[in-house]
Curated annotation (Swiss-Prot):
Interacts with host UBE2I; this interaction interferes with polySUMOylation. Interacts with host RB1; this interaction induces the aberrant dissociation of RB1-E2F1 complex thereby disrupting the activity of RB1 and activating E2F1-regulated genes. Interacts with host ATF7; the interaction enhances ATF7-mediated viral transactivation activity which requires the zinc binding domains of both proteins. Keywords: Activator, Early protein, G1/S host cell cycle checkpoint dysregulation by virus, Host nucleus, Host-virus interaction, Inhibition of host innate immune response by virus, Inhibition of host interferon signaling pathway by virus, Inhibition of host STAT1 by virus, Interferon antiviral system evasion, Metal-binding, Modulation of host cell cycle by virus, Modulation of host E3 ubiquitin ligases by virus, Modulation of host ubiquitin pathway by virus, Oncogene, Transcription, Transcription regulation, Viral immunoevasion, Zinc, Zinc-finger. A motif (LXCXE motif, interaction with host RB1 and TMEM173/STING) lies at residues 96-100. This is Early E1A protein. Plays a role in viral genome replication by driving entry of quiescent cells into the cell cycle. Stimulation of progression from G1 to S phase allows the virus to efficiently use the cellular DNA replicating machinery to achieve viral genome replication. E1A protein has both transforming and trans-activating activities. Induces the disassembly of the E2F1 transcription factor from RB1 by direct competition for the same binding site on RB1, with subsequent transcriptional activation of E2F1-regulated S-phase genes and of the E2 region of the adenoviral genome. One of its GO terms (cellular component) is host cell nucleus. Belongs to the adenoviridae E1A protein family. A zinc finger (unnamed) spans 145-165. Residues 181-193 have a biased composition (Acidic residues). Residues 180-203 are annotated as: Disordered.
């Protein structure tokens, strides 16, 4: 406490009054006249004396020509005027051509290889615009059919057929109720034949005819518990809807 100044040992009013009277606490340096007059634009455009020739002067002038700077300044001055309408800018011819080197040219051997692959793949390729799929129904299925020729040229399979010709050739195997008789065997017994038996009113021996059953639509009688459903009702009486359902205890 002995090292502290006198104004820190008193009460708060004395301390505050001592801070106000102290000179070095609020002794800020006054700004110089040069700093008040200089602006950011002046600091940016400061010309350094002593360097008469600059090696980068030409490069800087090429990037920012004086014509563009003068046009920008004139546009800014005209825009800040009272009329509010600036002068029309003059068109400037800019070189937008790219002078960078692109990808290296391809190897001629690679071009020859790709051309050979394309020529080899041309026979297997079918242009759909030139050879369109047209449905046809010739007298003989699979012969002289334009649809079959289209599928054969596309797939490369000389035996390919269209769906219509295939159905016409194999339709009897699908839509006939009974296959055609292939002839009786040497023994003459009908059991040895592979074709199915003819459809008759009486089924063959060993085949049980299905009997249609009518589904009952009557309601199940009310029960007191679920175990009653498992027991068979000997009376099997119909449900009497005039009676009230018994209450479950």
């Amino acid at each position: 406490m002995r090292m502290l100044p006198d104004f820190f040992t008193g009460n708060w009013d004395d301390m505050f009054q001592g801070l106000l009277e102290t000179e070095y606490v609020f002794d800020f340096p006054e700004p110089s006249e040069a700093s008040e007059e200089m602006s950011l634009h002046d600091l940016f455009d400061v010309e350094v004396d002593g360097f008469e020739e600059d090696a980068n002067q030409e490069a800087v002038d090429g990037m920012f020509p004086e014509r563009l700077l003068s046009e920008a300044e004139s546009a800014a001055e005209s825009g800040s005027g009272d009329s509010g309408v600036g002068e029309e800018l003059l068109p400037v011819d800019l070189d937008l051509k790219c002078y960078e080197d692109g990808l290296p040219p391809s190897d001629p051997e690679t071009d020859e290889a790709t051309e050979a692959e394309e020529e080899a793949a041309m026979p297997t390729y079918v242009n759909e615009n030139e050879n369109e799929l047209v449905l046809d129904c010739p007298e003989n299925p699979g012969r002289g059919c334009r649809a079959c020729d289209f599928h054969r040229g596309t797939s490369g399979n000389p035996e390919a057929m269209c769906a219509l010709c295939y159905m016409r050739l194999t339709g009897h195997c699908i839509y006939s109720p009974i296959s055609d008789a292939e002839g009786e065997s040497e023994s003459g017994s009908p059991e040895d034949t592979d074709f199915p038996h003819p459809l008759t009113a009486t089924p063959p021996h060993g085949i049980v005819r299905t009997i249609p059953c009518r589904v009952s639509c009557r309601r199940r009688p009310a029960v007191e518990c679920i175990e009653d459903l498992l027991e068979e009702d000997p009376t099997d009486e119909p449900l009497n809807l005039s009676l009230k359902r018994p209450k479950c205890s």
